[in-house]
């Protein structure tokens, strides 16, 4: 009986731990599991001095809170697995 109870406890802990792991894109085709406590994916886009040549810069990643937008910087946040694909790789 104790073995069954211990097994159930271990299975419960493993299942709860897996449920908290969010997967976000860190690059155009690079999904990674976020560290504990970082439960949001973000996409940050902006223009720099070379925007007319190479287009908008893109930063993807995980965050505990949605980063604060600054003038000229667009940020979107989401909370489901792989919800922040690189804008160039989104299906149309």
Curated annotation (Swiss-Prot):
Cleavable signal peptide: 1-21
CDD domains linked: TFP_snake_toxin
Protein location: Secreted
Keywords in alphabetical order: Acetylcholine receptor inhibiting toxin, Disulfide bond, Ion channel impairing toxin, Neurotoxin, Postsynaptic neurotoxin, Secreted, Signal, Toxin
InterPro entries the UniProt entry points to: Snake_3FTx, Snake_toxin-like_sf, Snake_toxin_con_site, Toxin_cobra-type
One cellular-component annotation, GO: extracellular region
Tissue expression notes: Expressed by the venom gland.
Cysteine pairs bridged by disulfides in the record: 24-41, 34-62, 47-51, 66-77, 78-83
Family annotation (PROSITE patterns): SNAKE_TOXIN (PS00272)
Top-rank lineage group of the source organism: Eukaryota
UniProt-recorded Gene Ontology molecular function terms: acetylcholine receptor inhibitor activity; ion channel regulator activity; toxin activity
Principal location class: secreted
General function of this protein: Binds with high affinity to muscular (alpha-1/CHRNA1) and neuronal (alpha-7/CHRNA7) nicotinic acetylcholine receptor (nAChR) and inhibits acetylcholine from binding to the receptor, thereby impairing neuromuscular and neuronal transmission.
Protein family: Belongs to the three-finger toxin family. Long-chain subfamily. Type II alpha-neurotoxin sub-subfamily.
Protein name: Long neurotoxin 77
UniProt source species: Drysdalia coronoides
């Amino acid at each position: 009986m104790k073995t069954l109870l211990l097994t159930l406890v271990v299975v419960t802990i493993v299942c709860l731990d897996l449920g908290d792991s969010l997967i976000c894109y860190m690059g155009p085709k690079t999904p990674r599991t976020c560290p504990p406590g970082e439960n949001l994916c973000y996409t940050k886009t902006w223009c720099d001095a070379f925007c007319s040549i190479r287009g908008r810069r893109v930063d993807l990643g995980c965050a505990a809170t949605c980063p604060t937008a600054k003038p000229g910087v667009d940020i979107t946040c989401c909370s489901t697995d792989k919800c922040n694909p690189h804008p160039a790789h989104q299906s149309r």
